[in-house]
Design a protein with these regions (language model features):
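Scaffold/interface architecture of coatomer-like assemblies
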Residues: 26-314
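Bacterial N-terminal signal peptides
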Residues: 9-20
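N-terminal secretory signal peptides that target proteins for export/translocation
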Residues: 1-4
Length: 314
């Protein structure tokens, strides 16, 4: 009996050791996989002080599995290049005119490493008034009053997809500041199943383009309809959240008093971004893979798109 108890105890002890090893290995990052890339914004939870985040502070998860982080580089110095498109809705109310000076000042304040383009959403396309340029003064001249014709831009998400698809690949950060009411007049329904919004998000994330948005009302009935402006801002928020950007002004009806606070916050975000590369698990079929970023550094969040598109395993 004593011998049997000793054998049983030894077996149980071995099983516990194997379980512990399995748990430890599950918590360790995988050492191989497909390189995947994200542009990450470091955002303080309280106040405005952003702590320095080092590579060893960053954790990337696919489900419960932790991936290996191979690169975490500040978007500064020789990696600071930024291509920024200002995308404005030509169906906006004339109230947008009072915000153009704020946008001009924001554009003029950009560093020399930033190229700026200006486009207007019209008939489902992005009509480029100014191609990307390092001449910020020249870019500001492309700003104009919106045409303010109801329905001129049936779906702002058609225009965003058009811009993304025509944007040449680049080693620089690529970001969009979208100014619109967000209302999809082409889709019509107010729900979370808008296929044109979904397609625009997919296109932006696959291209590595971050989209931020500021709400401004459109003309006509939709400019003061609580129902329509509610869904328009929900769509803009979803777009920004899914691409790693930020959406501003949940006011539902009426125009923001000023764009300045939102543009100041956007500028703060642009100066605290990092290039992240990690090794993702190769899927059996090419497709989307959800990822989650985490850090043990207090008072900070890591903001990015929540998924990456991966090729099939070879």
């Amino acid at each position: 009996m004593k011998k049997d108890r000793l054998i049983a105890a030894a077996v149980i002890g071995l099983m516990l050791c194997l379980c512990a090893v399995g748990i430890t290995r599950a918590q360790e990052p995988a050492g191989s996989g497909v390189p995947a890339h994200l542009l990450v914004t470091v955002e303080p939870r309280h106040g405005s002080n952003v702590p320095v985040i080092n590579r060893e502070d960053v954790m990337v998860y696919e489900g419960h599995d932790r991936d290996t982080v191979t690169e975490w580089v500040p978007a500064q110095g020789d990696r600071a290049a930024l291509e920024l498109f200002i995308l404005l809705d030509d169906g906006s109310s004339i109230s947008l005119g009072s915000q153009l000076e704020d946008i001009r000042q924001f554009m003029s304040a950009q560093p020399a490493s930033t190229k700026i383009g200006v486009a207007y959403m019209e008939d489902g396309t992005a009509h480029v008034e100014q191609n990307l340029t390092s001449d910020h003064a020249q870019a500001t001249k492309a700003l104009r009053l919106p045409k303010g014709i109801g329905g001129i831009n049936a779906s702002p998400y058609f225009s965003l997809s058009d811009l993304v698809k025509r944007w040449p690949a680049s080693e620089a950060r690529r970001e969009v500041l979208m100014v619109s009411d967000g209302i999809d007049r082409y889709y019509g329904s107010g729900d979370l199943e808008d296929p044109y919004l979904t397609e625009a998000i997919d296109n932006a994330v696959r291209a590595g383009i971050v989209v931020s948005a500021i709400y401004t009302p459109g003309v006509g009935h939709f400019g003061h309809s609580y129902w329509q402006t509610y869904w328009g801002q929900i769509y803009l928020s979803q777009l920004a959240e899914m691409t790693g950007g930020e959406a501003y002004y949940i006011g539902f009806t009426g125009a923001p008093v000023s764009f300045s606070p939102y543009l100041d916050e956007l500028q703060h975000r642009l100066t605290h971004q990092y290039w992240l590369t990690f090794l993702a698990k190769p899927p059996k079929k090419a497709g989307w893979q959800k990822v989650r970023l985490a850090t043990e550094v207090p008072n900070v969040d890591l903001i990015s798109a929540g998924r990456v598109y991966l090729p099939a395993a070879q």
